[in-house]
């Protein structure tokens, strides 16, 4: 359970209101890396799903006629699917017992995320994605109930951001494919 209490909040659709989120989160993870900080070989995989009860399918309300975002999202509903995979490949033979412990490593990554809804008139601004930036905070500077997907070379909140006043600042799906050459 999570409670969002907004009071004069200027960076989100809901300036004043209370929103409730009850969700069930399930994940399946596999990890075979040799070192969590300076990884030289192995892989990490994560598949997860998070969903809330479909309130709009059982409460009988017509959400197409509710204009107040605080009332429309009083009970947050969504289903969120994510997959993340990383593989680490040493580019030179791994050092033996007394040798140096460093080797160049190629890291490949694939990530996908999707945020779905039960009612097209009640699409949740909560739990959406915003890409760009360092990802150090785990959330965006503007909309705390969104997930920041780090992407090197871009500023925070710059890809699914507020560049156009008429565009939605939220992304409901993303994919990230990358390769990095590392020398730990």
Description of each model-found segment:
Residues 5-184:
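C-terminal outer-membrane beta-barrel translocator/porin domains of Gram-negative envelope proteins
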């Amino acid at each position: 359970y999570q409670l969002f209490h907004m009071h004069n909040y200027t960076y989100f659709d809901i300036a004043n209101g209370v929103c409730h989120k009850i969700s069930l989160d399930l994940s399946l993870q596999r990890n075979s890396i040799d070192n969590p900080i300076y990884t030289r070989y192995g892989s990490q995989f994560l598949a997860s799903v998070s969903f809330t009860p479909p309130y709009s399918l059982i409460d009988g309300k017509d959400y197409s006629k509710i204009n107040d975002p605080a009332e429309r999202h009083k009970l947050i509903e969504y289903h969120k699917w994510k997959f993340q995979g990383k593989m680490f490949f040493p580019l030179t033979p791994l050092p033996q017992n007394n040798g140096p412990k460093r080797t160049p490593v190629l890291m490949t990554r694939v990530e996908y995320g999707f945020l779905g809804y039960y009612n097209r008139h009640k699409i949740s601004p909560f739990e959406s994605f915003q890409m760009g930036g360092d990802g150090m905070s785990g959330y965006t500077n503007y909309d705390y109930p969104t997930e920041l997907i780090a992407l090197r070379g871009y500023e925070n909140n710059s890809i699914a951001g507020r560049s156009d006043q008429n565009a939605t600042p939220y992304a409901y799906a993303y994919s990230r494919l990358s390769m990095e050459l590392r020398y730990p």
